[in-house]
Amino acid sequence: VAPLAGGVYGGEPDDLSMRAAFPQLWELEGRHRSLLLGAMRARKGRGSREGGSLFFSFAEGLQALTRRMAEALGERVLRGTPVLGLEPVRGRWRLHTPKGALLAEAVVLAIPAPQAAGLLRPFLPEATALLKGIPHTPAATVSLAFPGALPVEGHGLLVAKGEGLRARGFTWTHRKWPGRVPEGFSLVRAYFSGEAARLSEEALIRLALEDLARLLPGLPRVHRAWAFRFPEGMPAYRVGHLDRVERLEMALVKAPGLFLAGNYLQGVGLPEVVRSGRRAAQRALAHLSLGEAHGASR
């Protein structure tokens, strides 16, 4: 479990809420009294997988989805327009931006917890404190392009603590997403978290190359390297996280028409984040419908 906890959350399993961070493992352990036994029975029940792929994305990356959504919505989307402030105004919400103020009947804050806390601080101190109490660990990725084919199998690996490597894991991108890599090249992505993720881009690239060289002796000279750092990249689901989320939802009752969505609530994976967004949208629509019904009854 430790490599999984480090690769996904950048932390140690002793610090995490298993029920919040890995609900499937929690369910397996509770049902079968053993993670190993539960995994074996679950695999046996699924049988063999026929055809298809374990992974799905867009040919141009996930940015293709947001770009297409913005194009479809047209002028209703204000791109490159940060929200500088938020305040309740007689049952509605005023959003302050560099382009002026906007008035809305409902607001969904689909932003990281630290930024959401900053917007809520003037009028929701309890929710602000709960959001600030969700720790975020720094994360970084390093992409390395090599000429030729590297001697790797599968789609990557997670690194166990004590192996002497600084990276938390590696993805063989040319095998996982073959359409994104030019023919004749291999592409590897390394993942870092914690203090290592705070290093400079040059230092991160050096560490990634050193770790990869230990795993793959005779590594060819890197053709190109990119490093990306995310100072508050990953929320950590510490023990008591689900209770914190429940208290956060109760605190938002004082702010009708305001809803939260994001990876710091009930899952960091894309499926969980999509569900979080849908849940917030459904609640916002229900709030708007209630307002319309109330107005019609006057």
Q: Whereabouts are the PLM-identified features?
A:
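A structural signal for the hydrophobic beta-strands that form the central parallel beta-sheet
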Residues: 77-79, 109, 260
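Conserved flavin/dinucleotide-binding core of flavoenzymes
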Residues: 169-298
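Nucleotide-sugar-dependent glycosyltransferase donor-binding/catalytic pocket residues
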Residues: 58, 135, 266
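Mid-domain catalytic core of redox enzymes
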Residues: 81-215, 249, 295
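Short, surface-exposed acidic
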Residues: 1, 128-132, 217-225
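Short, well-ordered alpha-helix to beta-strand connector turns
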Residues: 73, 104-105, 255
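Active-site/ligand-binding neighborhood in enzyme catalytic cores
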Residues: 1-85
